[in-house]
Amino acid sequence: MKILHFVAMISLLIFSSGAFAYRCVIDMRKIDEALSKQPAITEAQAQEVRKLRAEGEVLHNKGKHKESVEALHKALEILGVRQ
């Protein structure tokens, strides 16, 4: 029974990291789309969004998907985009 629990836990970890990886790409696309529509935010906010989006992409490419999603969600929050 312990082996079954262990296998289930490992499977969950493997699949959840893949879900984060996919989430990054979706969030980056949402940010790009929102920025292309010239949202009603200040230039300082737009710069912060671009910075967070770039940071999220770098983290994604390094395989740090949880951190990437966190940065991207901050950008989406500034843009007022639902996640």
Residue ranges and their predicted role:
Residues 1-7:
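Bacterial N-terminal signal peptides that target proteins for export
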Residues 16-18:
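N-terminal signal peptide c-region/cleavage motif recognized by signal peptidases
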Residues 21-49:
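Amphipathic, heptad-repeat alpha-helical segments
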Residues 31-34, 38, 75-76, 81-83:
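Alpha-helical solenoid scaffolds that mediate protein-protein interactions
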